[in-house]
């Protein structure tokens, strides 16, 4: 009685399970076997390891009233997604306690873990028997010429569609990596078309001839699968051999893709009638010079681009020439304040000529908003030392140029290296050739060429970038060795012959243009023009000013007598200078207006007295 009751409970439980299964598949008619607790694992081809899925529950093996006749389902208790697999001839099972491994028609490998080993062995035996039955049935059906999938006319449509879908997907997954080219059918659109370019067939190599028949072997009407025994082997080598099959498929894909490449190259060659490899060497030759230029870019740069005048300015102002040298005295030091009035007048007049002659000239074409050159900054410092604070030697751009003026260089080497500084500013003050007024560019070019020839006679053995530094004249020097460089005339007149060394063709394009100088430069020249004429420091228009400077840092070496002559400004030149300054310098006009008001107040005071 107890056994009958137990059998009734089991039968009742199976009826409930069958009803639940029929909700998902109405063609299920009987449950063959049950495994109480299983878990599903999948094999990852990329990671070559097993991964646990979220499918876990009871496994049911059942029969169906439609094809496929058998199948199994894992009723998932973790989620609503169940695992259903039809048992067909394409399934391949292998038992490895407590796992039952199988591969389906989609070449996916799964492992079913059983809580009970007896259930694992029983279900594995049942699965193998059902698979063999399906294979035998399929073999007999194809031999007789009758499809075993159609049971009756009512169910034939659905069964045929399911079978066709499974078979089409199976063939697609097996043949998608085939490299065998498709055979062109004998169509009139292909053979009778005169505009069609037909590729010339290329004879494959021996290795390709051996590889090409291999895909043909897999294109059978009935695809044959590798067994899990060949995949996984025995139990002791199961985990190692499971990883063999997916890499083999990837390797076959790579081999088949490599087989495609020579054939495609031959077709391209026949279509383009050119060797593809002939295009590659010119590409390399085009790329190599660009890379070489990038590699040796610093060697191709012009040496003048590294000079301090060409470097970016800090705070929007160019540093004066004195900031690039290390010496005991600077242009803006308080020692410059005590110089004579005649020297100041000469420097102001010289700067006035620089402004007059740089404006109509063709050399100065830059934006006036750019920083002033070193000579103009030095004049501003020497004229109004109270308005400019001298900078420390370590500020700004002083550090890179200091490499030129170390103590290891000889005196002439110092002069050569320092000559590059004023030579950079030739487009700015190159018109200071000694003319007493505004001269034409043709006359300026002639004078520059004459000066260059004379300088080359005296310094023929010097490098191309080094200018000749004449020695200091006795008339402008004082008792101290560096007094000539400290004075305001030296910062202007010393650079005058240096700017005449290079011809306009060799002027670098990176030289900085000049700005309008400080109005303090023109504060007193308007009130004392006779003293400027009496100072005797203005050069004659047709003569070259003699050597009046030595190296900017070195003491006097061999003084020579001075040959400086002067000529006064004409009324027309003075008128042009005043008109230019009034029109272009607001500060100059303000100074004149202040002087006018001061004279008017003094005249009123004298009348009142």
Curated annotation (Swiss-Prot):
Residues 201-222, 243-264, 326-345, 359-438 are annotated as: Disordered. CDD domains: Dcp1. It catalyses: a 5'-end (N(7)-methyl 5'-triphosphoguanosine)-ribonucleoside in mRNA + H2O = N(7)-methyl-GDP + a 5'-end phospho-ribonucleoside in mRNA + 2 H(+). Residues 368-378 have a biased composition (Low complexity). Its EC number is 3.6.1.62. The modification N-acetylalanine is found at residue 2. It is found in: Cytoplasm; Nucleus. Its main location: cytoplasm. One of its GO terms (cellular component) is P-body. The modification Phosphoserine is found at residues 147, 272, 333, 440, 503. It is an enzyme of class 3 (hydrolase). The modification Phosphothreonine is found at residue 389. The modification Phosphotyrosine is found at residue 191. Residues 205-219, 336-345, 418-438 have a biased composition (Polar residues). InterPro entries: Dcp1, mRNA_decap_C, PH-like_dom_sf. GO terms for biological process: deadenylation-dependent decapping of nuclear-transcribed mRNA; deadenylation-independent decapping of nuclear-transcribed mRNA; nuclear-transcribed mRNA catabolic process, nonsense-mediated decay. Keywords: Acetylation, Cytoplasm, Hydrolase, Nonsense-mediated mRNA decay, Nucleus, Phosphoprotein. One of its GO terms (molecular function) is mRNA binding. Belongs to the DCP1 family. May play a role in the degradation of mRNAs, both in normal mRNA turnover and in nonsense-mediated mRNA decay. May remove the 7-methyl guanine cap structure from mRNA molecules, yielding a 5'-phosphorylated mRNA fragment and 7m-GDP. Interacts with DCP1A. This is mRNA-decapping enzyme 1B. It comes from Pongo abelii (Sumatran orangutan).
């Amino acid at each position: 009685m107890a056994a009958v009751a137990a059998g009734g409970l089991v039968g009742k439980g199976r009826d409930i399970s069958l009803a639940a299964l029929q909700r998902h598949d109405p063609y299920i008619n009987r449950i063959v076997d049950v495994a109480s607790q299983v878990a599903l694992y999948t094999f990852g081809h990329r990671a070559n390891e097993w991964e646990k899925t979220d499918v876990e529950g009871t496994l049911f093996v059942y029969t169906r009233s439609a094809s496929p006749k058998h199948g199994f389902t894992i009723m998932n208790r973790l989620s609503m997604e169940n695992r259903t697999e039809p048992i067909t001839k394409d399934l391949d099972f292998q038992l490895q306690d407590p796992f039952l491994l199988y591969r389906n028609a989609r070449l996916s490998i799964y492992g079913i873990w059983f809580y009970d080993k007896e259930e694992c062995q029983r279900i594995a035996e049942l699965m193998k028997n059902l698979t063999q039955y399906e294979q035998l049935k399929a073999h007999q059906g194809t031999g007789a010429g009758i499809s075993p999938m159609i049971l009756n006319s009512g169910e034939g449509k659905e069964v045929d569609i399911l079978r066709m879908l499974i078979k089409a997907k199976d063939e697609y997954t097996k043949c998608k990596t085939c490299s065998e080219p498709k055979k062109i059918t004998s169509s009139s659109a292909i053979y009778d078309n005169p505009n069609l370019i037909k590729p010339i067939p290329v004879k494959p190599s021996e290795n390709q001839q051996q590889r090409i028949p291999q895909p043909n072997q897999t294109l059978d009407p009935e695809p044959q699968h590798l067994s899990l025994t060949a995949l996984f082997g025995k139990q002791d080598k199961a985990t190692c051999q499971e990883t063999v099959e997916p890499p083999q498929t990837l390797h076959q894909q790579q081999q088949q893709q490599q087989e495609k490449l020579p054939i495609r190259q031959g077709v391209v060659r026949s279509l383009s009638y050119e060797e593809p490899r002939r295009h590659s060497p010119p590409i390399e030759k085009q790329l190599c010079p660009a890379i070489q230029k990038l590699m040796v870019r610093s060697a191709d740069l012009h040496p003048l681009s590294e000079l301090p005048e060409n470097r970016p300015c800090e705070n929007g102002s160019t540093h004066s020439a004195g900031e690039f040298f290390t010496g005991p005295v600077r242009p803006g030091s308080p020692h410059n304040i005590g110089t004579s009035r005649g020297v100041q007048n000469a420097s102001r007049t010289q700067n006035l000529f620089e402004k007059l002659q740089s404006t109509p000239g063709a050399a100065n074409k830059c934006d006036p908003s750019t920083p002033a050159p070193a000579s103009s900054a030095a004049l501003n410092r020497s004229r109004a030392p109270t308005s400019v604070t001298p900078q420390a030697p370590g500020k700004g751009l002083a550090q890179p140029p200091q490499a030129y003026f170390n103590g290891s260089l000889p005196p002439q080497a110092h002069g050569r290296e320092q000559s590059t500084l004023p030579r950079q500013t030739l487009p700015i003050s190159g018109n200071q050739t000694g003319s007493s007024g505004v001269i034409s560019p043709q006359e300026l070019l002639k004078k520059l060429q004459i000066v260059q020839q004379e300088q080359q006679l005296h310094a023929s053995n010097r490098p191309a970038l080094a200018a000749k530094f004449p020695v200091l004249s006795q008339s402008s020097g004082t008792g101290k060795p560096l007094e000539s460089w400290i004075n305001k005339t030296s910062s202007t007149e010393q650079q005058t012959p240096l700017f005449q060394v290079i011809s306009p063709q060799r002027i670098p394009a990176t030289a900085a243009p000049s700005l309008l100088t400080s109005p303090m430069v023109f504060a007193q020249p308007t009130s004392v023009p006779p003293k400027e004429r009496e100072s005797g420091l203005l050069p004659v228009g047709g003569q070259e000013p003699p050597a009046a400077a030595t190296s900017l840092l070195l003491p006097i070496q061999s003084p020579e007598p001075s040959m400086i002559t002067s000529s006064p400004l004409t009324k027309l030149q003075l008128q042009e200078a005043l008109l230019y300054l009034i029109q272009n310098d607001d500060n100059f006009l303000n100074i004149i207006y202040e002087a006018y008001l001061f004279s008017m107040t003094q005249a009123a005071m004298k009348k009142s007295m």
